[in-house]
Amino acid sequence: RTVFCHDPLLRGAIRLNLLTDRVDIVRDLGWRRNTSALTDTDVKYLLLYFEQNYGLTSEKKMTAALSIVANENCYHPIQDVLNGLVWDGTPRIRSCLHHFLGAEVSDYVEEMLKHFLLGAIRRVFFPGSKYEEMLCLVGGQGAGKSSFFRLLAIRDEWFSDDLKKLDDDRVYLKLQGHWIIEMSEMLATSSAKSIEEIRSFISRQKETYRTPYEAQPKDRLRQCVFGGSSNTLDFLPLDRAGNRRFLPIMIYPENAEVHILEDEDASRAYLLQVWAEAMTVYRSGHYSMKFSKSIQRQLVEVQKDFMPEDTEAGQIQGFLEHYTGSMVCSKQLFKEALGHTYDEPKRWQLHNINEIMNTVVTGWKPFSNPRMFAGYGRQKGWERDVSGNELPGNEDEFVELSEEECRQLELPKEWIA
């Protein structure tokens, strides 16, 4: 340890990289090296140096001292870069995606990108901090979506697009040492077993595993965020409860001011200023990682544009637009709206109808106390919402009930003495 701390050549050269969780040699020590990370060859050179200059030959003691000194002299390369940025005062976050990819300039696009940038910054300064969303760029091939994420990572080694499967036992190796990870063309998403698996993976805050060189497993707090890209519009899974993990932005490369690879140095300089602006927001503390209600509503509507067509929801909504009754139940919708006249619904089919009525259909509200439905018995269901603009006519006017509604309101004969 004394040699590592006081030797003129070695002093300050051995540092623990908090991003990669590996020991780095951060300056030239006199032999050829291809990477900053400590290798077996480096250990052999160091052992030779110790033997020739100090007569020390114990590799075990040297490597133990090396680990201690590295841990005492740790650093985080991304933190160092971000802390060194100085913003020139020109706002770029709002127009960044338009500049490179032709996305519209709007509050929605600005908030999505700013949210992603702040999530990435927080993950670096507070590893494992909660960030459950994935920025998704949607548009034609060759627009520069992957290049945008790569250059946004500042250094190429801090970017990865090698995540192909979410259920890989060694997925942690794909994350370690990277800051921005692109799920290229959503391959990782589309091969996942379920929507819940995708949500669980994105929202995870740590990985727990043991490397071959460690005796005990260790929690690795996540320092990365995820970006997605797709050439197809319906890349989101059909999830009526919401795809809140995904933040889609449509790009129009023909509207871009410049292709991101046209002048890579200029693009990198531009993106450094984007990070500098984001760091200014981060340092101010005047931000929230929760979207405003207005942005949340926009996000839900935008997400619908990127989901497969929901045919059953359309059938039910169309049926209700011409339905004259004031109440419906799920069994009634199964038979009358979806056309299963002679079939009995399975539990999952009723659950599907409930989800549609509670999350997609407008103009109806649920009631929890079972009511009588002609031909369907006592059922929970939905009643027409006549509040606000949904009110049919003046609320003080008498509304005549249809024959079907009268039948629904009748008491069961067994209740009448």
Feature map (PLM): residue ranges:
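DNA-recognition alpha helix
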Residues: 330-342
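P-loop NTPase catalytic core of nucleic-acid-dependent motor ATPases
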Residues: 66-176, 180, 338
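N-terminal nucleic-acid engagement/recognition segments and initiation subdomains in replication
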Residues: 1-92, 107-111, 343-344, 348, ...
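Conserved catalytic/switch belt of AAA+ P-loop NTPases
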Residues: 195-218
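A short helix-turn-beta junction within AAA+ P-loop NTPase domains corresponding to the substrate/partner-engaging
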Residues: 238-256
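Conserved AAA+/SF3 P-loop NTPase catalytic/coupling segment centered on the Walker-B
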Residues: 180-202, 236-242
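Conserved alpha/beta core segments of nucleic-acid transaction machinery
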Residues: 281-325
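AAA+/SF3 P-loop NTPase mechanochemical coupling elements
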Residues: 171-176, 211-229
